[in-house]
């Protein structure tokens, strides 16, 4: 028996001071607490199984935070820490896997009112096909991989997050600014510029 937690939302890219209390709460509740309480609910049943497993689908944002994703990154980093602790607490009793995919061609950008046009093209260029992502994740689960990182962008974020934790984020911010797409507009412009 295996529990796969795959709930997640990506709030609109914007600076932290522009988030409402409701947006903050929603991101934490869906991206983190839903997994915590799902595990809490099903763990007693899973531990009675002959081959139990828990897999939390996280994000490359858990490996390195990007400007404009403060609440998403925080909730995904919390999920990473939770999953890593679970793995040690239940080592030998239950397989616990963490999956950190990069951009995937799904409708996660549905909530991004400004994701169309040039922004959508840029995201699609670095995104992994959904069917391919599923195959890679399923392979990892079948082989009980503790950590899965999939997608060119996810691997880049993993490397930069480890080797250049400060300057890596700066580099990604510079790329986001240079892309000059509406998707990231609220991240780098001040309130006066946004009003114009």
State what each model feature region is.
Residues 7-11:
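Conserved NAD(P)H cofactor-binding loop of Rossmann-fold oxidoreductase domains
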Residues 14-16, 20-25:
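Substrate-binding pocket helix/loop in short-chain dehydrogenase/reductase
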Residues 17, 66-70:
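Active-site loop immediately N-terminal to the catalytic Tyr-X3-Lys motif
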Residues 39, 75:
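Active-site helix of classical SDR
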Residues 44, 88-89:
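Alpha-helical segment proximal to the catalytic Tyr-Lys
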Residues 59:
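Residue(s) in the substrate-gating loop at a strand-loop-helix junction
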Residues 90-154:
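SDR active-site lid
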């Amino acid at each position: 028996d295996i529990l796969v937690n795959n709930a997640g939302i990506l709030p609109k890219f914007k600076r932290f001071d522009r988030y409402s209390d409701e947006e903050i709460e929603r991101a934490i509740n869906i991206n983190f607490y839903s997994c915590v309480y799902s595990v809490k609910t099903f763990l007693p049943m899973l531990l009675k199984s002959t081959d139990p497993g828990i897999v939390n689908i996280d994000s490359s944002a858990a490996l390195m935070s990007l400007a404009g994703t403060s609440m998403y990154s925080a909730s995904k980093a919390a999920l990473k820490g939770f999953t890593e602790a679970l793995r040690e607490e239940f080592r030998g009793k239950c397989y616990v896997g963490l999956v950190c995919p990069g951009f995937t061609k799904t409708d996660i950008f549905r909530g991004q009112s400004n994701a169309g046009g040039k922004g959508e093209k840029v995201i699609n260029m670095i995104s992994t096909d959904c069917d391919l992502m599923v195959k890679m994740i399923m392979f990892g689960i079948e082989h009980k991989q503790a950590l899965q990182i999939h997608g060119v962008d996810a691997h880049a974020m993993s490397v930069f997050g480890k080797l250049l934790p400060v300057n890596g984020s700066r580099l990604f911010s510079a790329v986001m600014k240079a892309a000059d797409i509406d998707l990231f507009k609220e991240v780098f412009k001040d309130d006066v510029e946004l009003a114009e």
